Amino acid sequence: MSARGPAIGIDLGTTYSCVGVFQHGKVEIIANDQGNRTTPSYVAFTDTERLIGDAAKNQVAMNPTNTIFDAKRLIGRKFEDATVQSDMKHWPFRVVSEGGKPKVQVEYKGETKTFFPEEISSMVLTKMKEIAEAYLGGKVHSAVITVPAYFNDSQRQATKDAGTITGLNVLRIINEPTAAAIAYGLDKKGCAGGEKNVLIFDLGGGTFDVSILTIEDGIFEVKSTAGDTHLGGEDFDNRMVSHLAEEFKRKHKKDIGPNKRAVRRLRTACERAKRTLSSSTQASIEIDSLYEGVDFYTSITRARFEELNADLFRGTLEPVEKALRDAKLDKGQIQEIVLVGGSTRIPKIQKLLQDFFNGKELNKSINPDEAVAYGAAVQAAILIGDKSENVQDLLLLDVTPLSLGIETAGGVMTPLIKRNTTIPTKQTQTFTTYSDNQSSVLVQVYEGERAMTKDNNLLGKFDLTGIPPAPRGVPQIEVTFDIDANGILNVTAADKSTGKENKITITNDKGRLSKDDIDRMVQEAERYKSEDEANRDRVAAKNALESYTYNIKQTVEDEKLRGKISEQDKNKILDKCQEVINWLDRNQMAEKDEYEHKQKELERVCNPIISKLYQGGPGGGSGGGGSGASGGPTIEEVD
């Protein structure tokens, strides 16, 4: 381990996240405080506090407009982005534009606040970091974070920024399927050699990813990636929600559509039913008072669920075919098929995939929800120099998800780096001028597979000026594309005759956060964290006062004490307890020190009487934070 403690692997998912750590030669997937090994990627804001994870998801029905999820669909994108615009129609929370970047708008502690997607993701990452710290019993400083294979440059960079805001040193951003392959490679280590082609089929809550990798002698190489950013478990839930909402309308002549809370409760029940249907052939749904006081009791069979989603399930095979084409492989050449993502538990999806591969066995040995975090944890251990033999000879080669190039005369896309090129990589090509005496060139950097740049995605542009006058075609301008291991791109253009050069790191034009923005967000994240802690302390002080008061009350009312305590003393304590209970009812939101002050006040009245009761005891001693023992905390201490 490094001097700074272990590094963790975080699978930052669209709907759920997962964290793992590699120690003592194996990976531990870490459960959260609710005992769950995956945590919802949800953040909620209320009048009094900020909630993250299970607590946020559990209150979504009561607070839909201030509960944020799907931040991963916004991260690194522009507000105008067509996918952002279409996603916004489905979200109960508000998305606004600031300088062309999307921000979510919420009411928090009575004020309107806006947050960048990076900030929301950083809150989820903070939760994952805290889960790991609670388990490891110390601070965590470094992490590997995973992203979908086809995240572009700005989405990767924004994810890295989210990690920075959290206060993590992001060792590397790696592709989710690559992480799953590492998990798998580690599982399969020690198999007799040769090159292995592996297909990773990753169907999660919100996204679908197919990747083909070759594994040989501990080296992973990604051959191709394909998928659908908008297919996953939530889509299957939605089909069931629509179906059952129709059924409710038929039975009860009521449309729950406009009622967000009813729809949300139905969706929660559908998600539960869907999970049940992976292991049973029927699931029952019971929702009390779903809408206008009407209960909804029904059931759904696995067959009906499969029929509702038939086209979506079948559609998962298209990206499989595309990935095979891109990798120039026949399906018979795939040695291993690995299932990743909770939705791969659906029996029908497993059957379709198995049939497509002519009955080949699927690998389900790794828990599909945890495989990505598992691999990220292994990669984190490698990067901080873990010397365990289990990870010693593992090398990781990632690829660029899209071709990268520049625009040349006539709006033509000229790629310098082809898609699926292993990274890190560096490519240089020489270009020249288009007209006589041209003194500058505009270098426009694009990503995409189309022949014309107008159909591709502009990443950034810059000018190279000061080219000495010369006939067209004479100057030699050398353009270099350099991608580092995180998939972040530097483009340089240099005039060979003068040595003059200009460069761009492809981030800023894509709405990358500035250094100042990140610093500000780091401070804000700290502030929110300390506010959360202060709130926890406040609640703890309130609970301590409450349990102390009730314990004392119970103690003096105890039959066994009859005759040991005077009526006067007893009433003095009971009156004071009642006064505190009344005060508590009126002051649920008081500050920590007010609760502590009240407790001291109560102790001042009670301690002398209680110590008289247990003669010879040293009167006093604080009643110490309500241990909840039936005899009351003071007594335990005095005894």
UniProtKB/Swiss-Prot annotation:
CDD domains the UniProt entry points to: ASKHA_NBD_HSP70_HSPA1
Single Gene Ontology MF annotation: glycolipid binding
GO biological process: chaperone cofactor-dependent protein refolding; male meiosis I; male meiotic nuclear division; negative regulation of inclusion body assembly; positive regulation of G2/M transition of mitotic cell cycle; protein refolding; response to cold; response to heat
Alphabetized Gene3D superfamilies for the sequence: 1.20.1270.10, 3.30.30.30, 3.30.420.40, Actin, Chain A, domain 4 (3.90.640.10), Substrate Binding Domain Of DNAk, Chain A, domain 1 (2.60.34.10)
Region (Disordered): 613-639
Positions bearing N6,N6,N6-trimethyllysine: K564
InterPro entries cross-referenced by the UniProt entry: ATPase_NBD, Heat_shock_70_CS, HSP70_C_sf, HSP70_peptide-bd_sf, Hsp_70_fam
Sequence segments annotated as region (Nucleotide-binding domain (NBD)): 2-389
Residue numbers carrying Phosphoserine: S403
GO cellular component, one term: cytosol
Location within or outside the cell: Cytoplasm, Cytoskeleton, Spindle
Compositional bias annotation for Gly residues: 616-631
Record comment regarding domains: The N-terminal nucleotide binding domain (NBD) (also known as the ATPase domain) is responsible for binding and hydrolyzing ATP. The C-terminal substrate-binding domain (SBD) (also known as peptide-binding domain) binds to the client/substrate proteins. The two domains are allosterically coupled so that, when ATP is bound to the NBD, the SBD binds relatively weakly to clients. When ADP is bound in the NBD, a conformational change enhances the affinity of the SBD for client proteins.
SUBUNIT field: Interacts with FKBP6. Interacts with ZNF541. Component of the CatSper complex. Interacts with RABL2/RABL2A; binds preferentially to GTP-bound RABL2. Interacts with SHCBP1L; this interaction may promote the recruitment of HSPA2 to the spindle.
Protein name: Heat shock-related 70 kDa protein 2
